[in-house]
Amino acid sequence: MPKYRSFKTTHGKNMSGARSLWRATGMNDEDFKKPIIAIVNSFSQFVPGHIHLKKVGELISDQIQKSGGVPKEFNTIAIDDGIAMGHSGMLYSLPSRELIADSIEYVINAHCVDAMICVSNCDKITPGMLMAALRLNIPSVFISGGPMEAGKIRKNEKEIKIDLVDAIMIGGQSNQCKNFIKEVELLACPTCGSCSGMFTANSMNCLTEAIGLSLPGNGTLLATHVDRKNLFIKSAKTIVKITKEYYHHNNKKVLPRSIASKESFENAMILDIAMGGSTNTILHLLAAAQEAEIDFNMSNIDELSRKIPHICKVSPSTSLYHMEDVHRAGGVMGILGELNRANLLNKQTQNILQLNLEETLKEYDIVLSKNPDILKMFKAKPAGIRTIQPYSQENRWLTLDYDRKTGCIRSCKNAYSQDGGLAVLYGNLAKNGCIIKTAGIKKSNYIFSGPARVYESQEEAVNAILKGEIISGDIVVIRYEGPKGGPGMQEMLYPTTYLKSMKLDKTCALITDGRFSGGTSGLSIGHVSPEAANKGVIALVKNGDIINIDITQRVINLNITEQELQQRIFQEESKKSLSYKPLNRKRHISYALKTYAFFAMSADKGAVRDRQKLSKI
């Protein structure tokens, strides 16, 4: 049987000093016989998705202790992408993912921790923790803080739902009155929790369910609902249970790398495509797969995107549904249940419940479940009360949304589209691929051509859009915003939202080697690989060049001859030390960001560090 890792610091005569320090944290002789379980929290007063996690950490700690473990809590950093967006702060968001993963490794290995429960929620925190769990491969459970309730506002004598993207969009409308802008600002984000649409945070928390590292309900159960408290308690019990399962019974099936197999990654990607999740999830799944040493790449994603239907449409792809509505329709398990009935899933993947997927769906898919407690959990309803207190209300729907024909979650037969919500495009403009979220795009825009309007920074593009320099039919190209070129691969929510506010979102396209917020909609193509700073063809595009996009055929091409392309490559490389660099951009790059840029690979590799460079150090 494997020994507790923590015994290296709690057993043996030569560890008296370490034990003395452990005692100073409140431990005693009995505790030295138990597993030390880290509560990897991400509480922060900067982020509404994390503002309530201090209480959550205390709740989990108490339950771990009751269940026979020794809880030890520490925090990771957490950046709010919505607050960091629209200025140089967004350069730091993606690089923080690597720092989160590294900091967890440092604390866990320095203190010989036996297991960990990851309390995450927002955009880069869940991926960073997932990378760490797969790197360390100790018993791990994920539990998110839960989604925010959708905002509500009265317009034209009707109550409509709103969210963060509405606040950004309306703020960008030059003809909008200040009073209405303020009203939306006050109502768009009413509670603690991750922003209420199928943005990056909620997408990732749904994917941890599909992978099998979190309990059913994790991705969709509201932060404010009392049922979330039960989920925290159950997660705490689960981490103690699987920790003992591994160390007492040598059951390696409960370890992250056993659970997060290639088949589990495929299930997660299938879910992502079916629900039209954030394009950022692709970046993070590719990065996590490398930590798990799994061969999962853009080709796998492309293959899946061609056969998975789009069966769940949520904001920002529609204003009708938010995460609270997905939950009422059965949550992640409801979506997976429909995919399973169409034989589109790997059914034998395992999870932290020590069940395979098919067994889990029998219990948690509302179409199949006979368990009244589970059906009651999916009736959790928003309260519509402004609060930052977790599990503070217990409202319930009278009925569940079983409508698989016209409801929030649909059967594969009644899908919103037989094409999935995400697609990978290839061509001379993106030799290694690029990503588009098709969930919010009309079929009439699946084939699109137009002249390029080229910008070498997000700021430059935003100014052009707001000044009215972009017209219907244009393709906005924003380059040198990739992992290396930015550096940091900024999100482009402001450019896409401002195109929407200018009524250009359905008649223009945007292409970038940067990335998009989960709140992005419209004809927005990101993750162009190779990026401009890595000698990608996007660096060679000129104003007025025609770009051809064909989503149906999965093609994106710069419409110039091969001879012209080679001539442009020659001209660019003749600039020598100035080649493949933005020439007119004024941007301060800190040493921390330069370090990230030096090691960063393009988006098709998950924007992770180049291990070949590391091996040469």
Swiss-Prot record:
It catalyses: (2R)-2,3-dihydroxy-3-methylbutanoate = 3-methyl-2-oxobutanoate + H2O; (2R,3R)-2,3-dihydroxy-3-methylpentanoate = (S)-3-methyl-2-oxopentanoate + H2O. It comes from the Bacteria. Gene3D superfamilies: IlvD/EDD C-terminal domain-like. Mg(2+) binds at residues 81, 123-124, 491. Its cofactor is [2Fe-2S] cluster; Mg(2+). Keywords: 2Fe-2S, Amino-acid biosynthesis, Branched-chain amino acid biosynthesis, Iron, Iron-sulfur, Lyase, Magnesium, Metal-binding. Pathway: Amino-acid biosynthesis; L-isoleucine biosynthesis; L-isoleucine from 2-oxobutanoate: step 3/4; Amino-acid biosynthesis; L-valine biosynthesis; L-valine from pyruvate: step 3/4. Its EC number is 4.2.1.9. Pfam families: ILV_EDD_C (PF24877), ILVD_EDD_N (PF00920). One of its GO terms (cellular component) is cytosol. GO terms for molecular function: 2 iron, 2 sulfur cluster binding; dihydroxy-acid dehydratase activity; magnesium ion binding. The modification N6-carboxylysine is found at residue 124. Homodimer. Belongs to the IlvD/Edd family. Functions in the biosynthesis of branched-chain amino acids. Catalyzes the dehydration of (2R,3R)-2,3-dihydroxy-3-methylpentanoate (2,3-dihydroxy-3-methylvalerate) into 2-oxo-3-methylpentanoate (2-oxo-3-methylvalerate) and of (2R)-2,3-dihydroxy-3-methylbutanoate (2,3-dihydroxyisovalerate) into 2-oxo-3-methylbutanoate (2-oxoisovalerate), the penultimate precursor to L-isoleucine and L-valine, respectively. NCBIfam families: ilvD (TIGR00110), PRK12448.1 (NF009103). This is Dihydroxy-acid dehydratase. It comes from Buchnera aphidicola subsp. Diuraphis noxia. The gene is ilvD.
